[in-house]
């Protein structure tokens, strides 16, 4: 397979299913990436959020070829983080599909959710944070995250949002993203993943000074203890930060 972004997009665009429903969270499109055995849970959570969305049937390892892995990752190279971990590239490409689809369709602001999510603070807090995010210059909102140093001198940019630009944070289970970022991210790098998807994203944001915010408290968590992991991440999710007192 020729390693081109449009080629990958055309190959897997049939994995999208457009679902209409009432309501909305204030973005041009919401995406939910789901494995087949989690679609029921994913649809339930998307119904709680409200609004039209695109369900993306996650790319699986059996849908990729040896050439895919060799030309788009370091899966076959000993000593690297992704060595012999065949679930990592499919995850990255599933997110790529959502990014690329947003560009193709001209969406200005999107949100992407994974299929094992929960909303511990309720949907109204999510909507409020998204509304504030759309009115600031920052380009990336992590509604949920992990491995963020909670004591690094962050600053408040709005009632619900904290500026964490330039810091290292991972876990991509709930993102809101502006088109300006997607353009930089896709045009600024080849379709190649030397690390796990969330590590590649975090490094890109830090190196390119992408304005990044998180909410006062995590608004979207992963139900890893209850649902497990289908991506080899079997450790329980670490605690997130509470920035209400900043």
Where are these regions (language model features)?
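An acidic/histidine-cluster motif and surrounding catalytic segment
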Residues: 2-113, 117-246
